[in-house]
Amino acid sequence: MANVRRHMQVDHRANLETAALAVGESLALAWAHFHLLRGLDNGRLQHPAIVTRFDLLYDRLWRAAFDAFFAKVGTLLDNKKGSDSLLRFLVLARRYASLEVKNVLPEIEVELSNQDAPLAKLKRWRHEVVAHKPTAHDAVGFHTQNRMTLTEIESALEQLDDYFNQISWNMLGLHSEHRSAFAGIVCQAELLFATTALGLATEPE
């Protein structure tokens, strides 16, 4: 692959690097919002009394992190022309790649278009619950068909990250680590819950 990258036209590489930077930033922020959701959920499980005491605050924090996460997922999966999405990055890769590199792209394209895959569920959540909220939306039916745990969401995000790095490595020789950049949010959220619980426990009657 090194030979393929060496002979890429300068302007093509520049276009790919610009797209990779934009997609990478969205991936990192998606991970940041996911880690916040995970931290809030862990805090809820470890200290349920805190959620009972501050129920409205917890609900709003969760909703804000939820909406922010799916906004970034929407950016990553947007198929509109000119968007800074993983799909746009894939289009550029197909346009500029040699035949050898193009052989690794169809599998990614198939998975991204698979309507039964976890990624399709993420896309539907963003479209029907966070972004557009169609008037004919059936909340009960939608939640039954598209229910996802945080672990399933995490797996889908890992898949997006993996697809990005497959393209980036084959086209640019670059591998990026997005997940760990904001991983400390989980521990910090847990610590916040624990500290608050301790403070409540020592409150005078």
Regions found by a protein language model. Give the residues of each.
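Amphipathic alpha-helical interface segments
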Residues: 1-118, 143-205
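Histidine-centered, metal-coordinating catalytic motifs and their short helical/loop contexts
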Residues: 112-140
